[in-house]
C-alpha cells in the first residue's frame, strides 16, 4: 500500500461541462456556489470563481475517493482532506495539487505519518508510528525515505543514530530504560546466499549489521541533523515502498539489531547484538493507495 500510486483519476476537462446548478456572473461563468455532475460520473459541490473551482469545495470521484478542502483556480491548495478508496486518508496542507507542508497520513493498516511534506512526498521532519508494534521513527525524511538523524523508539529501548536509504548507518547507540546505553556502529555487510541463489546471477545484497563497542551510563543525545536536501525536480511522487514506493505493500527493510536481547561480551570479541528472535523488524511498512490527481479545467458554459 502507498499514500499514492501510479494510477491517476482526472477531473473532467473544460470541454466536458456536464450538468451545473448554481450561481453565475454577468458573463455566464460559474461564479459563487454551485453543484456540477460531470460526464464521467464525478461530482463537485462548492465555490467557483470565474468558471473555476475556487474556495471551499468537495470533489467526489466515482470510485469512492473524495477531496474536501480548499481550491485555488481548479487546484487543491490550502487545507484539505483526501480520502482514498481503500479508506486511508491525508489531512493537511496542499500546494498546486500536491501534499505540501504539514500533514498527517492515516494508512489502512492504522500506521500514521505526521510531519512535513514536499511535492507529495514525506520530506523534512516527521514521525512514523507503527500501529502493530507501537514503535515509531522520529526524525528526518528525504524524498519519501527515512534519511538523516533520527530515533527508532521501541517499548523498552530506542536506537539513536543516522539513517540512509531507509537503513541505519554509521555510529549510533541503543538506549535502554534500565539506565544504560550501548554504543556501536552499523556496518554494511553482504548477506549469505543459498546454493540455488549462487547458481543464478550474482546479486550483491548489502544489509546493515550492528557491531557493539561499549556500554555506558545514560547521556543526553543531541542529534546533528544533516544539511537540508535540495527539493526534487518536477512533480515529486512518493512510490510504494516495496512496490516501488507503496503500490504493492512495502519493501521490507530488514536490519539486524532493532529488537532482541542485549548480550554484553568481552571487549576483544565482535558482538552482534539485538538479533531478532522471531520476526525480523521491517520498520518502513508503508501502506498504499491510488493517487488521484485532478487535471486543471475551466468549468464554464
Curated annotation (Swiss-Prot):
Keywords tagged on the record: Cell projection, Chromosome, Cilium, Cytoplasm, Cytoskeleton, Flagellum, Meiosis, Repeat
Major location category of this protein: cytoplasm
GO cellular component: 9+2 motile cilium; axoneme; condensed nuclear chromosome; cytoplasm; extracellular region; meiotic spindle; motile cilium; outer dense fiber
Compositionally biased spans, kind Polar residues: 279-290
GO biological process: axoneme assembly; epithelial cilium movement involved in extracellular fluid movement; flagellated sperm motility; mating; meiotic cell cycle; spermatid development
Tissue: Expressed in the trachea, ependymal cells, oviduct and ependymal cells (at protein level). Germ cell specific. Specifically expressed in testis, and to a lower extent in ovary. Not expressed in somatic tissues.
Renumbered ranges of MORN repeats: 20-43, 44-66, 67-89, 90-112, 113-135, 159-181
InterPro entries registered for this protein in UniProt: MORN
Subcellular location: Cytoplasm; Chromosome; Cytoplasm, Cytoskeleton, Cilium axoneme; Cytoplasm, Cytoskeleton, Flagellum axoneme
Composition bias type Acidic residues, residue spans: 1-20, 249-261, 292-301
Biased composition (Basic and acidic residues): 21-31, 262-278
Annotated region described as Disordered, given as residue ranges: 1-41, 225-301
Functional note: Functions as part of axonemal radial spoke complexes that play an important part in the motility of sperm and cilia.
Self-association and partners: Component of the axonemal radial spoke 1 (RS1) and 2 (RS2) complexes, at least composed of spoke head proteins RSPH1, RSPH3, RSPH9 and the cilia-specific component RSPH4A or sperm-specific component RSPH6A, spoke stalk proteins RSPH14, DNAJB13, DYDC1, ROPN1L and NME5, and the RS1 complex-specific anchor protein IQUB. Interacts with RSPH3B. Interacts with RSPH4A. Interacts with RSPH6A.
Name of the protein: Radial spoke head 1 homolog
Gene name of this polypeptide: Rsph1
Amino acid at each position: 500500500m502507498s499514500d499514492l500510486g501510479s494510477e491517476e483519476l482526472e477531473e473532467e476537462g473544460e470541454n466536458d461541462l456536464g450538468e451545473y446548478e448554481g450561481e453565475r456572473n454577468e458573463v455566464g461563468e460559474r461564479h459563487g456556489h454551485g453543484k456540477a455532475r460531470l460526464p464521467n460520473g464525478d461530482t463537485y459541490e462548492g465555490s467557483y470563481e470565474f468558471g473555476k473551482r475556487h474556495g471551499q469545495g468537495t470533489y467526489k470521484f466515482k470510485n469512492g475517493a473524495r477531496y474536501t478542502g480548499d481550491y485555488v483556480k481548479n487546484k487543491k491548495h490550502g487545507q484539505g482532506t483526501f480520502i482514498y478508496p481503500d479508506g486511508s486518508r491525508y489531512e493537511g496542507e496542499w500546494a498546486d495539487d500536491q501534499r505540501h507542508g504539514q500533514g498527517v497520513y492515516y494508512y489502512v493498516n492504522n500506521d500514521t505519518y505526521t510531519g512535513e511534506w514536499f511535492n507529495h512526498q514525506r520530506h523534512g521532519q516527521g514521525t512514523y508510528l507503527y500501529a502493530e508494534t507501537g514503535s515509531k521513527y522520529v526524525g528526518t525524511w528525504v524524498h519519501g525515505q527515512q534519511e538523516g538523524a533520527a530515533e527508532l523508539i521501541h517499548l523498552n529501548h530506542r536506537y539513536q543514530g543516522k539513517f540512509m536509504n531507509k537503513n541505519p548507518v554509521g555510529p549510533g547507540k541503543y538506549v535502554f530504560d534500565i539506565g544504560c546505553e550501548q554504543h556501536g556502529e552499523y556496518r554494511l555487510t553482504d548477506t549469505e546466499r543459498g546454493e540455488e541463489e549462487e547458481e543464478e546471477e550474482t546479486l550483491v545484497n548489502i544489509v546493515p549489521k550492528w557491531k557493539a563497542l561499549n556500554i555506558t551510563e545514560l547521556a543526553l543525545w543531541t542529534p546533528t541533523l544533516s544539511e537540508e536536501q535540495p527539493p526534487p525536480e518536477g512533480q515529486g511522487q512518493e512510490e510504494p515502498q516495496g512496490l516501488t514506493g507503496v503500490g504493492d505493500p512495502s519493501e521490507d527493510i530488514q536490519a539486524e539489531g532493532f529488537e532482541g536481547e542485549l548480550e554484553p561480551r568481552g571487549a576483544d570479541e565482535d558482538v552482534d547484538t539485538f538479533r531478532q528472535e522471531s520476526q525480523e523488524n521491517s520498520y518502513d511498512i508503508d501502506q498504499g493507495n491510488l493517487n488521484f490527481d485532478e487535471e486543471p479545467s475551466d468549468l464554464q458554459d
